[in-house]
A protein has these predicted regions:
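C-terminal helix-rich "cap/oligomerization" subdomain common to oxidoreductases
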Residues: 12, 17-20, 117, 169-200
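Predominantly a Rossmann-like dinucleotide-binding segment in NAD(P)-dependent oxidoreductases
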Residues: 21, 28-100
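Structured beta->alpha junctions
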Residues: 26-29, 104, 130, 183
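Generic alpha-helical segment signature
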Residues: 30, 157-160
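Contiguous beta-strand/loop segments that form the cofactor/metal-binding neighborhood of enzyme cores
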Residues: 75, 81-153, 164-174, 192
């Protein structure tokens, strides 16, 4: 939504003042497979810890991604590109982040350690600049019910359609969606905090 807290807050306040519905497109919140998983395990509770790895290899030799030419991704890296997606899974399951520690690793990698309102903790590893053979996405929860992993999802097209449907429903009902501009503002606050701690 924005890469500064001030910018995100301006958007959120404008939406509130105009009384308009909003959606922030965090893919995994709307892809049918992952949205159902988030809802199920958020309702289950009893989670002790979680780990999210979002490891991209956009600029590795042999990589063939249309996103590799993006100047914005080169400048802001995995923290801002894929960080919102990882957090958009962890927060609805484990609760809001109450404390965050961040550190940098090799090739623009960011490591986050999070405490959540539920009492659980989680760790997150984010990069777009890993070797090609190291790339992948994995999110696991561990708790009273065992170990569960995020299912695979079928791209962004279906998720985008679901996000549009959610926006229309929010307009019709007047009920705010949990992944709206206020959630986008919260994500921006967390990512800006992580960036400041780890160093640009």
């Amino acid at each position: 939504m924005a890469t500064t807290v001030e910018g995100a807050r301006e958007v959120a306040e404008a939406a509130e003042q105009a009384r308009v519905a909003s959606i922030v497109f965090c893919t995994l919140r709307f892809a049918p497979e992952t949205a159902a998983w988030i809802a199920e395990h958020g309702a289950t509770g009893g989670w002790f810890t979680a780990h999210a790895e979002w490891i991209g290899a956009l600029w590795a030799p042999g990589a063939e991604s249309e996103f590799g030419a993006s100047p914005w991704r080169r400048e802001k890296g995995g923290l801002w590109d894929v960080g919102p997606h990882a957090l958009s899974v962890l927060i609805p399951v484990l609760g809001d982040v109450t404390a965050l520690t961040a550190a940098r690793g090799p090739a623009g990698t960011h490591h986050l350690v999070l405490n959540h309102a539920s009492g659980a903790s989680s760790t997150v590893t984010l990069t777009l600049a890993a070797p090609l053979a190291a790339a992948g996405v994995d999110i696991q929860l561990r708790g009273e019910h065992g170990i569960v992993g995020l299912p695979r999802w079928e791209g962004a097209v279906g998720a985008f359609g679901a996000a549009v449907d959610a926006l229309i429903a929010s307009v019709r009902t007047g009920e705010a969606h949990p992944c709206d501009v206020r959630f986008g503002l919260r994500l921006t606050e967390l990512l800006a905090d992580a960036e400041a701690q780890a160093g640009a």
